[in-house]
UniProtKB/Swiss-Prot annotation:
One of its GO terms (cellular component) is ribonucleoprotein complex. It is found in: Plastid, Chloroplast. This is Large ribosomal subunit protein bL20c. It holds the Pfam family Ribosomal_L20. The keyword Ribonucleoprotein applies. Its main location: plastid. GO terms for biological process: ribosomal large subunit assembly; translation. Gene3D superfamilies: 6.10.160.10, Ribosomal protein L20 (1.10.1900.20).
Amino acid sequence: MTRIKRGYIARRRRKKISLFASSFRGAHSRLTRTITQQRIRALVSAHRDRDRKKRDFRRLWITRINAVIRGVGVSYSYSRLIHNLYKKQLLLNRKILAQIAISNRNCLYMISNEIRKEGDRKESNEML
């Protein structure tokens, strides 16, 4: 059987993996077998948390909007605001509403008051 000269293929592969794990602590950045395990684990976490980040930010935006909106009226809440926005066909997503709530509360108060006034007028006309 003839000799096969592979050069430095294995070293190159291990070097690439160790560069990925160079910021890990202890054996996770030194031992090849644990590096590969930690690399798989890190990539799984990154993949999972990309989806989770979207959920977390949506929850944060909803919390911010709700906190500001509850200051408007006793019986007014986030769900009523979103319902009224949909009825009026206003295209403001939760991210924009949260930015308005943080930076300029008066603007959000004005939006919610206008929506509520028009909603109250329609309801009073329907009762008559």
